[in-house]
A protein has these predicted regions:
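N-terminal ligand-binding/catalytic initiation module
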Residues: 30-33, 41, 74-78, 99
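Short, charged, surface-exposed secondary-structure boundary motifs
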Residues: 49-51, 66, 112
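Short amphipathic alpha-helix with an adjacent loop that forms part of the alpha/beta core around
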Residues: 61-75
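Hydrophobic, well-ordered beta-alpha structural blocks that scaffold small-molecule cofactor pockets
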Residues: 1-44, 48-51, 55-58
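Short, ordered loop/turn segments at secondary-structure junctions
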Residues: 43-45, 60, 107-111
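Structural motif
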Residues: 14, 78-79
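ADP-ribose/adenylate-binding Rossmann-like module
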Residues: 79-85, 89-112
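Generic hydrophobic alpha-helical segments
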Residues: 49, 61-64, 92
Length: 112
């Protein structure tokens, strides 16, 4: 599969990160530089994440995508990052694709 680099203005956009470990922290650190509003969904998160994001202390389910708003509005581009167990990532990728939400699976380049 060939990948096309994409530049997106993320300032003020909602970003959902699923997972609260080291991979999620690296992604969040980078995204914060671009002015995103970040929500993390995970039963546990590293302490540094707690201070920088809105944390939903729970396991992911499909309603987490619905809570982000209407993805059809051009002004509310939503980019979802998945950084957890492979089976959870697979579900998130499927859920996002059904709803036409751009998704990046940090652990599987084929699902970007």
């Amino acid at each position: 599969m060939a990948y096309f680099p994409l530049f997106v203005d993320l300032e003020g956009r909602q970003v959902l990160v699923v997972g609260g470990g080291k991979i999620a922290m690296r992604r969040v650190r980078t995204l914060l530089e671009f002015g995103c509003e970040i929500t993390v969904v995970s039963p546990e998160v590293c302490e540094e994440l707690r201070e920088k994001v809105l944390w939903k202390k729970k396991r992911y389910d499909e309603t987490d995508l619905e809570s982000l708003g209407n993805v059809g509005e051009a002004s509310r581009f939503i980019f979802v990052l998945a950084a957890t167990a492979p089976e959870v990532n697979e579900k998130i990728v499927c859920d996002c694709r059904k709803k036409k939400i751009p998704v990046n699976n940090a652990s599987n380049r084929d699902q970007c």
